[in-house]
């Protein structure tokens, strides 16, 4: 199999074959958004020699098929050709072309421009970042306020710096919470801190929802689902805070 005289077979499965309008025997294999491989063949079932060209890609027909290529041992590398941007109006946009899935049958001496991975299953436009919805600052603001509220609550219960009216029999029996005499003073301080962080998260959630609905036509489904998740976190935080107010009242 490693002999240099052995032929090389490369198989493209479920590949978009772009048929050239000028010749029925010229095919283009798209490799990326700006590269392609041009093939010439008398039939799609026999031996197919490889040729490259810088001719602008103007295609009118797309074929889905399994395309097997046979190369001589002298071929050691297949290099995609960069195409020009003179694609005529009305042709399919570049971003819907699927990257070929390449399978080497009996040798690994050939390197195809398309990698042997799952890139061929990614259809549609590339996902662009949206810092207004899923930026580092937005996520950090949400997580920071949530963790600070949790740490303040745990510290208050562990140190007994809470109001006696907030301690239940379950807290005393299972968690052995002991309320100190000066707990009511620190309890008001901790409660105000929790209110500040909760208000911050609520305002941030409202701002994210406004930004999401303002750009609803341009954002991706993933960013919309991410914004809905952040809004759910803000809603749950607000409901927990209102429950605490009802208990205190």
Swiss-Prot record:
The chain crosses the membrane at residues 138-158. Glycans are attached at residue 106. The keyword Glycoprotein applies. It is a single-pass membrane protein. The lineage of its organism: Eukaryota, Fungi, Dikarya, Ascomycota, Pezizomycotina. This is Elsinochromes biosynthesis cluster protein HP3. GO terms for cellular component: membrane. The keyword Transmembrane helix applies. Keywords: Glycoprotein, Membrane, Transmembrane, Transmembrane helix. It is found in: Membrane. Part of the gene cluster that mediates the biosynthesis of elsinochromes, pigments consisting of at least four interconvertible tautomers (A, B, C and D) that have a core phenolic quinone to which various side chains are attached and which play an important role in fungal pathogenesis. The non-reducing polyketide synthase PKS1 was proposed to iteratively catalyze decarboxylation between acetyl-CoA and malonyl-CoA subunits for polyketide chain elongation. It comes from the Eukaryota. It comes from Elsinoe fawcettii (Citrus scab fungus). Induction: Expression is not affected in the presence of large amounts of glucose, during nitrogen starvation or at alkaline pH, conditions highly conducive to elsinochrome accumulation.
């Amino acid at each position: 199999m490693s002999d240099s005289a052995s032929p090389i077979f490369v198989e493209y499965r479920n590949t978009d074959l772009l048929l050239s309008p000028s010749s029925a025997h010229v095919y283009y294999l798209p490799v990326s958004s700006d590269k392609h491989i041009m093939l010439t063949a008398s039939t799609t079932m026999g031996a197919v020699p490889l040729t490259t060209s810088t001719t602008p890609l103007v295609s009118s027909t797309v074929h889905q098929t399994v395309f097997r290529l046979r190369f001589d041992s002298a071929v050691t590398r297949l290099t995609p050709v960069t195409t020009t941007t003179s694609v005529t109006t009305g042709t399919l946009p570049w971003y819907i072309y699927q990257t070929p899935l390449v399978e080497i049958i009996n040798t690994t001496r050939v390197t195809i421009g398309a990698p042997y991975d799952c890139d061929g299953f990614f259809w549609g436009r590339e996902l662009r970042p949206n810092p207004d919805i899923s930026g580092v600052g937005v996520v950090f603001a949400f997580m920071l306020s949530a963790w600070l509220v949790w740490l303040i609550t745990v510290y208050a219960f562990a140190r007994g710096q809470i109001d006696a009216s907030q301690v239940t029999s379950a807290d005393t029996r299972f968690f052995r919470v002991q309320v100190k005499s000066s707990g009511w003073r620190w309890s008001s301080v901790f409660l105000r801190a929790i209110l500040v962080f909760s208000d911050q998260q609520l305002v941030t959630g409202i701002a994210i929802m406004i930004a999401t609905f303002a750009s609803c036509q341009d954002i991706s489904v993933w960013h919309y689902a991410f914004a809905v998740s952040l809004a759910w976190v803000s809603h749950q935080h607000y409901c927990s805070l209102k429950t605490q107010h009802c208990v205190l009242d």
